[in-house]
Amino acid sequence: MTNLLKKFNEQQMQVLAKEIPEFRPGDDLKVTFKVVDGTSERIQIFEGVCISKRNRGLHSSFAVRKVSHGESIVSQFFVYSPALVSVQVTRKGKVRRAKLYYLCKLFGKAARIKERTTYVKKKSK
């Protein structure tokens, strides 16, 4: 029985696969998704910090936090959802935790995350 579910999930993941860049908690993301209001459909952009990532095959998801008008908003997105259009990494953050739920209580400068720098090794002669 579990093999049937596993095969079904793998098939659905291949059908719903999208080009999503690799990102980690602490990274600033720009998520574009479809919103359906009755009969009309529009595209909305949600920019914020990734505070968690959940890798569970077809049920994989990630949470993004942004501050709007002084209020903290956390939105959960499913990776294989047909409503998800694209994800862009705008800035890479340096954090030491996998889940950054403590950021929800912080505002302003206290909620800042340092930028992660990547170094390229030079080939020696």
Curated annotation (Swiss-Prot):
Record GO terms (molecular function): structural constituent of ribosome
Keywords annotated in UniProt: Ribonucleoprotein, Ribosomal protein
Record-linked PANTHER family: LARGE RIBOSOMAL SUBUNIT PROTEIN BL19M, RIBOSOMAL PROTEIN L19
Lineage: superkingdom: Bacteria
Descriptive protein name: Large ribosomal subunit protein bL19
Assigned GO CC terms: cytosolic large ribosomal subunit
Gene3D superfamilies, per database record: 2.30.30.790
Protein purpose: This protein is located at the 30S-50S ribosomal subunit interface and may play a role in the structure and function of the aminoacyl-tRNA binding site.
InterPro entries for the chain: Ribosomal_bL19 (IPR001857), Ribosomal_bL19_sf (IPR038657), Translation_prot_SH3-like_sf (IPR008991)
Pfam annotation, one family: Ribosomal_L19
Lineage: Bacteria, Pseudomonadati, Pseudomonadota, Alphaproteobacteria, Rickettsiales
Protein family (similarity comment): Belongs to the bacterial ribosomal protein bL19 family.
HAMAP family noted in UniProt: Ribosomal_bL19 (MF_00402)
Source organism (scientific name): Wolbachia sp. subsp. Drosophila simulans (strain wRi)
GO biological process: translation
